[in-house]
């Protein structure tokens, strides 16, 4: 089972925020996640990012592959 770290959309119409989740790569975007990693809210200025680094490290050690967007958020959060 290949696992991805990716975003799932939450919120209302035109007021979106995103949860960062670990999910089976074959599952649909709104499918049941294996774990919740954090969230990303682009609607506030500056954009709010909260990531549980321990969970991220755990999933990366298990071979999870982050999407390009999540990878950028991880880099931004590490600074």
Swiss-Prot record:
Q: Which domain of life is it from?
A: Bacteria
Q: Which SUPFAM superfamilies match?
A: Ribosomal protein S16 (SSF54565)
Looking at the keywords, is Glycoprotein present? no
- Print the keywords alphabetically: Ribonucleoprotein, Ribosomal protein
A GO biological process of this protein is:
translation
| Record bears the keyword Ribonucleoprotein | yes
A GO MF term: structural constituent of ribosome
Q: Which residues form a coiled coil?
A: none
GO cellular component annotations of the record: cytoplasm; small ribosomal subunit
Entry similarity comment: Belongs to the bacterial ribosomal protein bS16 family.
Record's PANTHER family? Answer: 30S RIBOSOMAL PROTEIN S16, SMALL RIBOSOMAL SUBUNIT PROTEIN BS16M
Q: What name does UniProt use for this protein?
A: Small ribosomal subunit protein bS16
């Amino acid at each position: 089972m290949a696992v991805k770290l990716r975003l799932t959309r939450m919120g209302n119409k035109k007021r979106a925020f995103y949860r960062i989740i670990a999910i089976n790569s074959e599952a649909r975007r709104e499918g049941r996640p294996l774990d919740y990693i954090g969230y990303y809210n682009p609607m506030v200025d500056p954009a709010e990012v909260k990531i549980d680094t321990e969970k991220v490290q755990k999933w990366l050690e298990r071979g999870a592959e982050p999407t390009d967007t999540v990878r950028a958020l991880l880099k931004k959060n590490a600074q």
